[in-house]
């Protein structure tokens, strides 16, 4: 079995479990799935796990600060000013290796906005982002494990055909 099939199986099973349990876990399944995809986009593996979680956490914090700061400033276009400042910061933080996955920060801020951009959704969004990344990591490990457990097949063709 190749990796594409084994990852399809593991993601399918884990995503089905996630969606079934999301409400009782107080997580947003769509945010988990976005973060899950970000894990693979970051290059996967342990480094991808670290970079995705770090960038996701900063992104959701930045999203919260953008909305909060715009409310404090209270002038027309305050939201645009806050977005400009924090979009710059999301890119600038990439100079630090652990925060170098820029799409993670942007998608996580967008997830906060998409979930309603209210203080009461912050924990659910942050938890969902972390859970989605961990599910990406687990699905990757399980897919590779399935590939290793597959028994090699013996070809019917003999390598010595001169007999």
Predicted region positions:
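Canonical alpha-helical transmembrane segments
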Residues: 37-52, 64-68
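Alpha-helical transmembrane segments and their membrane-interface boundaries
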Residues: 1-44, 117-125, 135-150, 160-163
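Hydrophobic faces of alpha-helical transmembrane segments in multi-pass integral membrane proteins
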Residues: 6-18, 50, 54-66, 81-90, ...
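Hydrophobic alpha-helical transmembrane segments in multi-pass integral membrane proteins
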Residues: 64-73, 115-125
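Interhelical loops and loop-helix junctions of multi-pass membrane transporters/channels
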Residues: 1-4, 8, 85, 106-114, ...
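Short, amphipathic, aromatic/basic-enriched membrane-interface segments that mark the entry/exit
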Residues: 1-4, 22-25, 46-54, 71-76, ...
